[in-house]
C-alpha cells in the first residue's frame, strides 16, 4: 500500500486549482443511466471512485469514454445488475438502483462498501423507492427493485435528512408518472448540481437547494452537456492547509457560495478572506490561528466532511476549541493519530475538546477514512520532522493528486510506493 512521506514544517502559500466535486460527479454519472441520448459531463475529477463508477456503467452496457470530459451513452444498457466485485469498494453504487428501476422497470445492486464511518444504511433509499411503487427484495446480498410499468409519483417525507436517499428518490421520480414531492430533502450543493444536470436532460424539477423538492415526471430524458460544480470540501481543505501553516493561498475554480459556514469559521480563526465569482483567497499574515467552536450538521450548516480539518486547526491554534459531530458517529478516528504527533485532545461522546499546542512533531500515523487522512497529511506539513501517513488509498478516493497540489504550495511531500 502506498504511503506519504512528509517533511515539515513548511508554510504553505501559492495557488491551487480546485477539481470538480466528487460528491456531485458520482450521482451525476449514475443519473446518466436515465438518458436515452449521449451526455457529456465536464470537470469530473480523476479519482478512484469515479473510475469504479465508469467501470460499473460499462458493465451495465453503457458506452463510457474519458477524454477530458466523460462521455456516456446509455442508450444500449442491457444489464440491470451492479455486481459485488465493483460495489464492494464504493457505496455510491447504490445510486444505480433508482435510474435502473425508473427507466427499465428493474435493477439490482449488491449491498455497498466504502468508508467505514458509523451507520449509513441503505434503508432510506429502499423505502423511498417503495413509496414510488417499486417492489424491493433483499436476496443473496443484493437489493433487487422492480416495477410493473412506470413508477408512480408520491408525497415522500424523509425520516431523516439523507443526501444519498434524496438523490435516489429524485432520480427515480424524474421518469415516474405524476408528481413527486420530497419533504425534508437534503439541501447540499451537490443535490442542486445533480438536479440541474437532470433538468439539462429534460427533467422537471423545482425546489432543489430547499428542503422541499418537487419533481414532475416526464416520459423520457434526452442528452446534454453539463459541468460539475467545484469541490467545496477540497477547497476547504486547502484553505485550512494555508491557515494552519500561517500562509496564504488563492483557490481558483472555486465556488464561494457553497462554503459560507466554513469561511465564517476561518474568519473567526483570524484568517483574512476575500472572494470573487470563482476564487477564494486566504491570508494569515504570518499569524497563528485562534481556536473556534464548530458543530457539524446538514447543509447549510458546517459540513461533517470539514470536521477533521478543523479539529487539526484547533489542535495547533491559540486557546481551546470544541468540535461537536452530529452527522456521523465514530468520526474522530483521526484524533488518536494526531495525539501521536503531540496534539492535546479529549473526546467526550460526540465532542472533541482541542487544546492548541504551538507545534506538532512528525510521527508514523495511519489514515482511517477519507477526510481524516487529509488532516493527517496537513498535520505532517506543519509538524517538526518526518511524518509517514499509511493507508493513503483513502485519500485517493476523494482528492485528485493532493501531493502535487500541496507540493505546488511548498510542501515537502512524496508518495512512497507500497509493496
From Swiss-Prot:
Task: Provide GO CC annotations from the record.
Answer: cytoplasm
- Does the keyword field hold Transferase? yes
Sorted alphabetically, which keywords does the UniProt record give? Answer: Cell cycle, Cell division, Cell shape, Cell wall biogenesis/degradation, Cytoplasm, Peptidoglycan synthesis, Pyruvate, Transferase
**Gene Ontology BP terms:** cell division; cell wall organization; peptidoglycan biosynthetic process; regulation of cell shape; UDP-N-acetylgalactosamine biosynthetic process
Q: In which pathway does it act?
A: Cell wall biogenesis; peptidoglycan biosynthesis
Chain positions recorded as phosphoenolpyruvate binding sites: 22-23
- First-tier enzyme category under EC: transferase
Cited InterPro entries: Enolpyruvate_Tfrase_dom, Enolpyruvate_Tfrase_sf, MurA_subfamily, RNA3'P_cycl/enolpyr_Trfase_a/b, UDP_GlcNAc_COvinyl_MurA
Q: Please state where this protein is localized.
A: Cytoplasm
Statement: the UniProt record of this protein carries the keyword Cytoplasm: yes
Could you cite one Gene Ontology molecular function of this protein?
A: UDP-N-acetylglucosamine 1-carboxyvinyltransferase activity
Tell me the Gene3D superfamilies matching this sequence. Answer: Enolpyruvate transferase domain
Reaction catalyzed: phosphoenolpyruvate + UDP-N-acetyl-alpha-D-glucosamine = UDP-N-acetyl-3-O-(1-carboxyvinyl)-alpha-D-glucosamine + phosphate
Q: Where along the chain is the active site annotated?
A: 115 (proton donor)
**Protein known as:** UDP-N-acetylglucosamine 1-carboxyvinyltransferase
State the organism of origin: Salmonella schwarzengrund (strain CVM19633)
Amino acid at each position: 500500500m502506498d504511503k506519504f512521506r512528509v517533511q515539515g514544517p513548511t508554510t504553505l502559500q501559492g495557488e491551487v486549482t480546485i477539481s470538480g466535486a466528487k460528491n456531485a460527479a458520482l450521482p451525476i454519472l449514475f443519473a446518466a443511466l436515465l438518458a436515452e441520448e449521449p451526455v457529456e459531463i465536464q470537470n469530473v475529477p480523476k479519482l478512484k471512485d469515479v473510475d469504479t463508477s465508469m467501470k460499473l456503467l460499462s458493465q451495465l452496457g453503457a458506452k463510457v469514454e474519458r477524454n477530458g470530459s466523460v462521455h456516456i451513452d446509455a442508450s444500449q444498457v442491457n444489464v440491470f445488475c451492479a455486481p459485488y466485485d465493483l460495489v464492494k469498494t464504493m457505496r455510491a453504487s447504490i445510486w444505480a438502483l433508482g435510474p435502473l428501476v425508473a427507466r427499465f422497470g428493474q435493477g439490482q445492486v449488491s449491498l455497498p462498501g466504502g468508508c467505514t464511518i458509523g451507520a449509513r444504511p441503505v434503508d432510506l433509499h429502499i423505502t423511498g423507492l417503495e413509496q414510488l411503487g417499486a417492489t424491493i427484495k433483499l436476496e443473496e446480498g443484493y437489493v433487487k427493485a422492480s416495477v410493473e410499468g412506470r413508477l408512480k409519483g408520491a408525497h415522500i417525507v424523509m425520516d431523516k435528512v439523507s443526501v444519498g436517499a434524496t438523490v435516489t428518490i429524485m432520480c427515480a421520480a424524474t421518469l415516474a408518472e405524476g408528481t413527486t414531492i420530497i419533504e425534508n430533502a437534503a439541501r447540499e450543493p451537490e443535490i442542486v448540481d445533480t438536479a440541474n444536470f437532470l433538468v439539462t436532460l429534460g427533467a422537471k424539477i423545482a425546489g432543489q437547494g430547499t428542503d422541499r423538492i418537487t419533481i414532475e415526471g416526464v416520459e423520457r430524458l434526452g442528452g446534454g452537456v453539463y459541468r460539475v460544480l467545484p469541490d467545496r470540501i477540497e477547497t476547504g481543505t486547502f484553505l485550512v492547509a494555508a491557515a494552519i501553516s500561517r500562509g496564504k493561498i488563492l483557490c481558483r475554480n472555486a465556488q464561494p457560495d457553497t462554503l459560507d459556514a466554513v469561511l465564517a469559521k476561518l474568519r473567526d480563526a483570524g484568517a483574512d478572506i476575500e472572494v470573487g465569482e470563482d476564487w477564494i483567497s486566504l491570508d494569515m499574515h504570518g499569524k497563528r490561528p485562534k481556536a473556534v467552536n464548530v458543530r457539524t450538521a446538514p447543509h447549510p450548516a458546517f459540513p461533517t466532511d470539514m470536521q477533521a480539518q478543523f479539529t487539526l486547526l484547533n489542535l495547533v491554534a491559540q486557546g481551546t476549541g470544541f468540535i461537536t459531530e452530529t452527522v456521523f458517529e465514530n468520526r474522530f478516528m483521526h484524533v488518536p493519530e494526531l495525539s501521536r504527533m503531540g496534539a492535546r485532545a479529549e473526546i467526550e461522546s460526540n465532542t472533541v475538546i482541542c487544546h492548541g499546542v504551538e507545534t506538532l512533531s512528525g510521527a508514523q500515523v495511519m489514515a482511517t477514512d477519507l477526510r481524516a487522512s487529509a488532516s493527517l497529511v496537513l498535520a505532517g506539513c506543519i509538524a517538526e520532522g518526518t511524518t509517514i501517513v499509511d493507508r493513503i488509498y483513502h485519500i485517493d478516493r476523494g482528492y485528485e493528486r493532493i501531493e502535487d497540489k500541496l507540493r505546488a504550495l511548498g510542501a515537502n511531500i512524496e508518495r512512497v510506493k507500497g509493496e
